[in-house]
Curated annotation (Swiss-Prot):
One of its GO terms (molecular function) is lipid transporter activity. This is ABC transporter A family member 8. InterPro entries: AAA+_ATPase (IPR003593), ABC2_TM (IPR013525), ABC_transporter-like_ATP-bd (IPR003439), ABCA (IPR026082), P-loop_NTPase (IPR027417). It is a multi-pass membrane protein. It comes from Dictyostelium discoideum (Social amoeba). Residues 516-750 form the ABC transporter domain. The chain crosses the membrane at residues 29-49, 244-264, 303-323, 326-346, 356-376, 393-413, 455-475.
Amino acid sequence: MSIGETIHREFIHLKLLLKKNFLVSIRSYFSTIIELLSPIVFVLIFYIIYSYGSAVDYSNVSYEQNLPNCIVSVENRCINLMFSPMNSTCTVEIMKILAKNNNMEIYNYPTDTGPLPNLENTIGFHGGIIAMDSLNSTEQFILAHPNVTLAVVDFENFPLNFTINGVKPNDSLIGFNDFYDLSFNVLLNLSTSGGFIEPVDYSIPVTTSIQKAIYDFYAINNQKQIPTINFDSTQFIEYSSVNVVSLFGGLFYYCAIMISFIFLLYKVAFEKEKNLKQGMVMMGLSRSMYWLSWVITSFTIDLIICLLLIAIGAICKLPFFLGTNFLVLLLNFFLFAISSSSMAFFMLTFIGKTKVAIGIGMAFFIVGSGLQLTFNSLGSLIFQIIYQTDSNGAAFVRVILFILPMFHFSKVLTDINDKVQSYPTSQFKISDLNDNLDGSQYGMDYLVPTTGQSLAYMFILVIVYLSLSAIIEYALSGGFSFKTVKHINVPHFDDQDVANATNRSLDPSNKSPFIIRGLSKTFNKFLRPSKSVHALKYLSLDIQEGTVLGLLGSNGAGKSTTIGILTGIHSPTSGDAIIYGHSVVKDIHSVRKITSVVPQDDILWLELTAMEHLHLFAELKGIPVRERDFQIAKVLEQVKLTKVANDQCSTFSGGMKRRLSVAIGCIGDPKIIFMDEPTTGLDPRSKRRIYTLVKEIKKDKVIILTSHDMHEIEILAQNLVILNDGIMVCNGNALQLKTKYGEGYSVQVIAKSLEVIPEIINFVTSSLPYCRFLKQSALQLNFGFPINTDPKIIVNFFKRLESITKDENNNLMRDWSISHSNMDDVFIKVSNKPKLQ
């Protein structure tokens, strides 16, 4: 196949799978609506909590007499007190005494601090008092830098008799509002940056310190009349819900996106559990296009969910969404969503059961929610601890958390929250992605990645997880095995028919369309070679065109492994099969073009119609458009499903689903058809239809049929192969096998109780020469004896059986019957035949 043909085939497969995913999503509208509406529901719940404000319960605090020292929280600086106006002589004199009483320095704005809005010279301040020119300047700084200043005092009025060293100063605040009062306002910081950090009300110590400074001033200046002191207290900025945003915001955004993670695990695991993926691969589907279709589908759903999440957040006017650049929001949510989906694809290379998928998905959801709550509650502090430079423990935690997309997602949320908590004054812009977050506090140095780096880490996880998924899937499908045909020495077979079939298949001049030569398969146990399973051992045979081969064997005999190798699901350990000139080892793609499968498990999606299934597989098999409708109509009529062609498979009975699977296997006029128990679950009438169909289509084909119904095998198969423990133990038609392995006559006896079974076995085997006990099924016992047994002995035996069963006091048997040996008897005997020497 040329490169152009390969690309075209891959594109067709991708288009088909995307169409299938779209139709299944539309028809499964209930689950699709739940998945897509999850962000709206979670954000609305959060909005209700947000609207009720912070749930922080402020506790009682004891204060010392002096002004308390500030503690560094969100920035590498903190300021005890800011005051204004600095051009008021009276104000400055009072604040000098306050600074002296509390051993603090006064810094003037802007000469000592640097200009607004950043006041760069204050970086590294741990305490002190800053003199501002006006209350307006002070408020600008507070809005830009919340949680940095404990309080602000703004003086409004001094009494007319206010003097400094006996001299009345030239101050516009003297007698400005009242002739006799000294008035000032105190602005308090009651906002907080973390859910576990409760704000402290410093109104009492701040006011007490100011009053003490005023009293000291009057005492120093020998003024006996102390004025009436009036003050108002106001919170800096009323972040009524800042704790709710910090504590729960990220949790709800996380949950809104992780719902799609659980849905993805379930949907893909469902297709694997129902063998839908494997069935399509056996019909020629490209494995890489299967996974690519799911990547495109899941990433598209992730994008829709992220856009809905951002839209509902903006509609609810949540500061997080209004104060953050749209591109930053989209990058954060979308990268988290697709990195989580990529991690899901990595897990799905090992997960094949829906219960396991849901369990793992819920475990990640719950554990991740706990981590998210912890990260958001501690804010930037937790990342400073994790990214500290001198801790081996922190380095170990970083390595573990790095592989989790939720860790980087939480980091970005925290960075954004630190900026937008004072929205609208402060917003998160594109330029903030590169802000330096390194620093040192609490005795530790830390190198925290920028917000942009955290986004890049999530993108790296997308690449890593998808690459690992592709590599593991390729390895599990045998992609890394060297495509060469290995041969082993021909073993010795006791059965002459098996030996002849083996020698015939190995003959280089054999021109049969279907030749199997020394096919073997060993499933090795990693690190436990002694536990390796030899599933197939040197299977060799040839099949002529127009033949139905019955492949028989008990469970674990090697039937499924044989079909898996011939359809490319497994790679053989040694040997090869040549199918119409194409090697299954070297050219499986060409083999699949002429091969079709009716698997034991129906390859059906309940959401699709019979017609949609047939169109899907017709295009998958490469049937030309001009022939497609005719082929579909033909197979629908053959399995009598024409009237329900446009009904969804969810409305079909088990028999109808099975007939549709047979129709799918027959479409496209394949040269080879593998039928794995095609009539399972069918009523007798439907079985006859399938029998007729098989007889009609076998003319120019090779059909390999497996079944546990020996009557069905006798009707359909011209040649039978029985496997036992991976070995071909007999090869021939039904008459040959019954002649060779049959017991002649078969006697069935139904015992009255389990206790009398040993007595019945002894009675029958002693009454008939060379009689053998074959099997027991509950109370039914089967015996076989040679066809050349003396008729007199047989007649006498039957008379004794008849007299026993007619005796009302008989406690041995209820009934008995006799028949010629059938394929069931042959199968039982052959299954116990000595194995390969």
